[in-house]
């Protein structure tokens, strides 16, 4: 393990699909000076408006598996019942920490567990919806997924919601400004 990963401030953000992680991350990237946001690598297709290399690094399953084999991933997981692979590239985080920048890593539940296991000093944040009903409304209201995908994401969300006590911090996203302020404090 690189010494760079054992020093510096790393905040790991997780939460269910449609809880507003992307919105909160976008705001944090503008509001927190010097913040390094670790762009996750994924095998899922981009949603409308998402930019490769900015929102996610979009790759094929084969490319993702090559990165795993070459030990280029800090963590990775097969998520939503095998629907996609998603993970965190290692090198950009090492570089940001070497530059003494705070690091924000957005991952799923397994990713948060894996990073915490490898780097116990990280602060984990669970971004929670105001209610289950609100989460279902947000997910179905996006209009970007099929009913089958929505059902899988809701199944995953049930497991994630039941696991929030594992996190160092729980931030309820009923107001984006308040959620951003709370996570900004944790990053300081």
UniProtKB/Swiss-Prot annotation:
Residues 8-188 form the Guanylate kinase-like domain. SUPFAM superfamilies: P-loop containing nucleoside triphosphate hydrolases. ATP binds at residues 15-22. InterPro entries: GK/Ca_channel_bsu, Guanylate_kin-like_dom, Guanylate_kinase, Guanylate_kinase_CS, P-loop_NTPase. GO terms for cellular component: cytosol. Keywords: ATP-binding, Cytoplasm, Kinase, Nucleotide-binding, Transferase. GO terms for molecular function: ATP binding; guanylate kinase activity. Its main location: cytoplasm. Belongs to the guanylate kinase family. Essential for recycling GMP and indirectly, cGMP. This is Guanylate kinase.
């Amino acid at each position: 393990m690189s010494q760079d990963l054992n020093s510096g401030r790393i905040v790991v953000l997780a939460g269910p699909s449609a809880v507003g992680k992307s919105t909160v991350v976008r705001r944090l990237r503008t509001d927190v000076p010097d913040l390094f946001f670790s762009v996750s690598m994924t095998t899922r297709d981009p949603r409308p408006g998402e930019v490769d290399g900015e929102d996610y690094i979009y790759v094929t399953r084969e490319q993702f598996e090559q990165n795993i084999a070459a030990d280029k991933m800090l963590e990775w997981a097969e998520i939503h019942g095998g629907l996609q692979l998603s993970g965190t590239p290692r090198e950009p985080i090492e570089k940001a920490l070497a530059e003494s920048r705070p690091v924000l890593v957005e991952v799923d539940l397994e990713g948060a567990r894996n990073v915490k296991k490898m780097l116990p000093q990280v602060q984990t944040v669970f971004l929670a919806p105001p209610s289950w009903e609100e989460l279902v409304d947000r997910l179905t209201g996006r209009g970007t997924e099929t009913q089958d995908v929505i059902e899988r994401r809701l199944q995953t969300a049930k497991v994630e919601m039941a696991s929030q006590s594992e996190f160092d911090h729980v931030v309820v996203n009923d107001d984006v400004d308040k959620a951003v302020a709370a996570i900004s404090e944790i990053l300081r």
